[in-house]
């Protein structure tokens, strides 16, 4: 897939000549995201594109003359050529402004959408393929999406003209319609090439200047009225295009098809909904089990297209700096979780969309039967164990971890809810009562995977789930990298909000020396913040008390930057590996060598080629794992 994305920069020269130096250590450590996107640009589009992206990231918006001034080795013609390809791939946005003298200047901005499409390119194709069952449909959909990703956008007319003679035109046209209806392909518009913050400013100035100069309104009321009107226009421009303007009916075949000359591009927001569903399914599997997670996966699949976006576009306009606007946006997003059309479902909807090979019989047990088994087990057990202090303890008094977990989980549900948990005598493998039982499990646990808005009607509360998911992923990373002790102290600080070292000593049940060492490590990685509280009026440092707290924003931002650096470093090492073995790789890719490597290559060359391929695959697998964690803190 990287090869097809590399071909995307049609006019970008992918040359190895070292006109522009490779990423320096200073740049890599100064800004991890700059390091990441620069490496992605270099690996896919070449050194010149990487240099332009690096300048746009470091300096902000720039004109062509400013880019040439900062990178004289590129030249004006080369800069313009690179910008055309970057704009085509949605890696750069632009805005034309008029100066006081009347001169028009075009400024170019960095746009991360294009680079995220490159990072997820392989998984995007797999995600689209998963929407279809037939192999022919999967192949056609994959080819369409690959071409859209490689070119940035395309029209159905241009794609049809490039088809081979043995490909059915009607099947391809029908697939375009399906991809548009699923939301993966959307019409390309000027909004894709314009920064949202600048779009907001343009609309705001237009509305504000439209207010009569002799208006008696106060400035505060003028701004409030302007803001309200701007929001309406802003949301109108960004809302989904009406299908009537995209799809048409072919008069000859009476089939629906996409308009021939309408350029289509990939909808990254729709794909991220799919990634969000995948994250939540994995989270549910770890908390409530594989069978409820399977039910949850079906529920997410039938509602994810209608579900709200990962973030509100208004968040990118600067309105989040105002507390009232921030709270209003959060309330609107929470309301959209329940009120948007198509986001609610019931057990019948799940039953209708379950795979045919699913059998839910035996996956739930009635509470009455479980209590009988437990009482029988307790009645039969009369053995006694001797504890360390010499006390004899009955075996049935030592509850297992599973029993304690079951008890804690059941505390969150009412008796009426528990009555649904039975399957004795139910012969239907997709029984609605069984599905309802699993939905109750998902909605009554400590983590609200679902919320029952009305009896039998459920929805997914993304606004409540995302913070819990972030916390769970963050804790898992801390526990796996810094150890269980760090995770224990982190939870201790979080549970007590603001805590002293003495409280940690009493609750963490660890040695004081170990606690101080672990706290120092957590502070180093921004997992815990230190707050100095003076105890005297003169604020003497010797009498101050140091308390510890968790600032989730700082902790998550640091983790996001850390993961971004690791992704970039993985790509950087892979590119260095390819450069060091450039001669061997070029030789192995020759047409007369392909398929005959064992005959034409030396044994040492074969071993080296095997090593390069293995390291490249390992780097790619590492990058995919890091991306799955990075997206939790970056986009979800």
Swiss-Prot record:
Q: Which UniProt keywords apply?
A: DNA-directed RNA polymerase, Nucleus, Transcription, Zinc
Q: Which InterPro entries match?
A: POLR3C_WHD, RNA_pol_III_RPC82-rel_HTH, RNA_pol_III_Rpc82_C, RPC3, WH-like_DNA-bd_sf, WH_DNA-bd_sf
Location in the cell reads: Nucleus
Q: Cite the GO molecular-function annotations of the record.
A: DNA-directed RNA polymerase activity; single-stranded DNA binding
The answer to keyword Coiled coil applying to this record is: no
Q: Which family does it belong to?
A: Belongs to the RNA polymerase beta chain family.
Assembly notes: Component of the RNA polymerase III (Pol III) complex consisting of 17 subunits.
**PANTHER family listed in its UniProt record:** DNA-DIRECTED RNA POLYMERASE III SUBUNIT RPC3, RNA POLYMERASE III DNA DIRECTED -RELATED
The entry's function note states:
DNA-dependent RNA polymerase catalyzes the transcription of DNA into RNA using the four ribonucleoside triphosphates as substrates. Specific core component of RNA polymerase III which synthesizes small RNAs, such as 5S rRNA and tRNAs.
**What is the official name of this protein in its record?**
DNA-directed RNA polymerase III subunit RPC3
Lineage in the entry?
Eukaryota, Fungi, Dikarya, Ascomycota, Saccharomycotina
Record gene name: RPC82
